[in-house]
Amino acid sequence: TLSLHDALPISHSEQLIPHMDEILKDAGVDQKEITAIAAAKGPGSFTGLRIGLATAKTAAYIWKVPLIGVDTLEALVWNLVGARAFILPLLDAQRGNVYAAMYGSFDEIWQEAPAEAASIDEVVKAAASHGGPILAVGEGAEMYREKLLAEGIQVAPPHNCCARASSVAMAAFVRWEKGQIDDPLQLMPNYIRRSEAEVLWEKLHGMN
């Protein structure tokens, strides 16, 4: 798994491809050795998802390698593979809301509840009634640590709460082995909800 953690300039779209070339060179990997591309497809930052996924799709098309899209919440679960608990991945959705789902991580990983955008209070209430050991992970878990702990939901250590390219790769590898390959022309970001800009535009134009 190759990943780049250096901060990128504001013009992400212009800098991403050169940085990909740079990390391949630093790792001593030739582009021809790349056999597949994995990319997080959301939820998450609207702009980040568009740029990241568009870059992955372009690279997969040009390099003629398979593309596997991975749910961002599922990738967080792979940070805790083998935890033998139910995993509650949480990402900040702003204004007291989070992107959330529920997964089981025992002998294998499976999805218990679908991804949604909801208030943290609603998510905590639902999770607390789920039963079984529950471990929250992600930036949302860090933000609402005290609220989660108050309901008996454990929170993963900070170093396990960040997004990891390696976790995206592990989740993608499982799909790849099952032949679950995405069409670069059809794979779209999974925003879950509309952006604030779209909501504001509709309000300004009198649309519901």
Placement of each model-derived feature along the sequence:
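Short, small-residue-biased leader/transition segments that mark boundaries at the very start
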Residues: 1-8
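DPxDG-like acidic metal-binding loop motif
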Residues: 38-67
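Phosphate/pyrophosphate-binding loops at sites that engage ATP/ADP/AMP, CoA/4′-phosphopantetheine
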Residues: 20-35, 123-134
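Surface "functional belts" at beta-alpha junctions
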Residues: 66-162, 191, 196
